Design a protein with these regions (language model features):
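Intrinsically disordered, low-complexity serine/threonine- and proline-rich regulatory segments
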Residues: 1-47, 53-54
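Alpha-helix N-cap and coil->helix boundary residues
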Residues: 43-44, 60-64, 80
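DNA-recognition alpha helix
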Residues: 61-73
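Basic amphipathic alpha-helical segments that dock to polyanions
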Residues: 81-91
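Non-DNA-binding regulatory cores of transcription-related proteins
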Residues: 90-162
Length: 162
């Protein structure tokens, strides 16, 4: 099965359906995913891909992923993790979600869906694609086309009336 990051299965689906979640087989699967996405399988990309491309969909920050890598003995700088995540996003393997331009999450689910952002918990929660509708989009300026639409709904706790 060839992987097309724009139309094919998600990287996590390819990995979870074909291999166990450990060992050399996992590294080989990640290498294949990276090559199919047009990325050279470097040690750092393989290590981070092995943590990301699992059956469970997740939202993760570079700092969170760096901590996971450290627990497994993979010493990488946060900058390396951030750059690698951006490369994965550019290749269509994951989605990038920016919060106020200050904090960046990466989503392993590249399918169409929106997100809630729970402000006081700094947490991202998926909204199923069928649970939200978007009306007609505006016509873009001459010479441009719409490449994607991201929906992020910010949530704060309801206040109890006194």
């Amino acid at each position: 099965m060839l992987f097309n990051p724009h139309t094919g299965p998600q990287a996590s689906q390819l990995l979870s359906k074909s291999l166990p979640s450990f060992g050399k087989q996992r590294a080989l699967a990640v290498k294949a995913i990276l090559r199919r996405a047009g990325l050279r399988p470097t040690r750092q990309r393989i290590a981070l891909g092995s943590l990301l491309f699992v059956e469970t969909h997740r939202h993760i920050t570079p700092g969170m992923l760096n901590e996971e890598a450290l627990l497994l003995g993979e010493k990488l700088s946060v900058a390396t993790v951030y750059n690698t995540l951006n490369q994965f996003a550019d290749a269509g393997l994951i989605r990038k979600i920016s919060i106020h331009g200050e904090r960046t999450y990466f989503d392993t689910d590249t399918g169409d869906h929106a997100h809630f952002y729970i402000c006081d918990q700094d947490q991202i929660v998926d909204i199923a694609s069928g649970d939200i509708g978007i009306g007609p989009l505006p016509v873009p300026p001459a010479g441009y086309k719409i490449s994607k639409v991201d929906v992020l709904i910010h949530l704060v706790p309801e206040t109890t009336p006194s």
